[in-house]
A protein has these predicted regions:
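N-terminal Rossmann NAD(P)H-binding glycine-rich loop of SDR-like oxidoreductase domains
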Residues: 16, 20, 24
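Rossmann-fold cofactor-recognition segment
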Residues: 47-60
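Active-site loop of short-chain dehydrogenase/reductase
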Residues: 72-73, 119-131, 163-167
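Conserved mid-core segment of classical short-chain dehydrogenase/reductases
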Residues: 83-98
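Active-site helix of classical SDR
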Residues: 112, 146-147
């Protein structure tokens, strides 16, 4: 199912910066009539087509209020996400681990649940679920686990949404140059590269976009022996 942005109404979660901000910019550039730019505390925008809207993906009442306020939405960019300084599943603070899952998994799924009837009522439309190469490689603890869980949920949601004529695209990528990756010394894609790949894929009707070589390699690694992905586990 190809998706046309011409005169579409788009809602972006986590829109204050990073990938979210770029999704807002590119949706408008592709012809969207309106973009709801959501965040816990939404920023001001200098474009009248952008509507700042409060949305905390960890708060059910906030999600429901946003779904009611943005009842003309036809495309949802499910982008909000968090990480934590110590996300070790063995030693990380349990409250912090739960916070990561509340945003990256439960919050993201809650957004789809709340907006699915809205998108259906507006002609079917689409969701873009922003995942990570870490959906398939445990480079971190809680963050990787939360993204793996969300990837699995998106696969289930995709089948359910398709029955109502709604498309779901999953986006995977390695490191992206955003505030979340500040201080990480590794090759990174730009937000422009990742969002362009995602929206090109959505317009083409793709189910999944692997936006860089890191994501491609991570998915291929799922079918490889465990030792190939995690060399420290290799036995002499």
């Amino acid at each position: 199912m190809s998706i046309d942005f011409s005169n579409a109404v788009v809602l972006v979660t986590g829109a204050n910066g990073g990938l979210g901000q770029e999704f807002v910019r590119q949706a408008l550039a592709r012809g969207a009539a309106k973009v709801y730019a959501t965040a816990r505390t939404p920023r001001a925008w200098d474009d009248s087509r952008v509507v700042p809207l409060a949305l905390d993906v960890t708060d059910a009442a906030s999600i429901d209020a946003a779904a009611s306020a943005a009842g003309d939405t036809s495309i949802v960019i499910n982008n909000a996400g968090v990480t934590t300084a110590n996300d070790s599943l063995l030693t990380g603070d349990v409250a912090e681990l739960r916070r990561v899952f509340e945003t990256n998994f439960f919050g993201a799924v809650a957004v789809v649940r709340a907006f699915a009837p809205v998108v259906k009522a507006n002609g079917g439309g689409a969701f873009v679920d922003v995942h990570s190469a870490l959906s398939w490689w445990a480079g971190t603890g809680a963050y990787s686990a939360s993204k793996a869980a969300f990837w699995s949920a998106s696969n289930s949601l995709r089948v359910e949404l398709d029955r109502d004529g709604t498309h779901l695209l999953g986006l995977h990528m390695g490191y992206v140059d955003t505030p979340m990756t500040a201080g990480i010394d590794a090759p990174m894609s730009t937000v422009d590269q990742i969002v362009t790949a995602a929206l090109d894929g959505l317009e083409a009707g793709e189910y999944e976009v692997l936006a860089d070589d890191v994501a491609v390699g991570a998915k291929q690694g799922v079918s490889a022996p465990i030792e190939a992905a995690y060399p420290s586990l290799a036995r002499a």
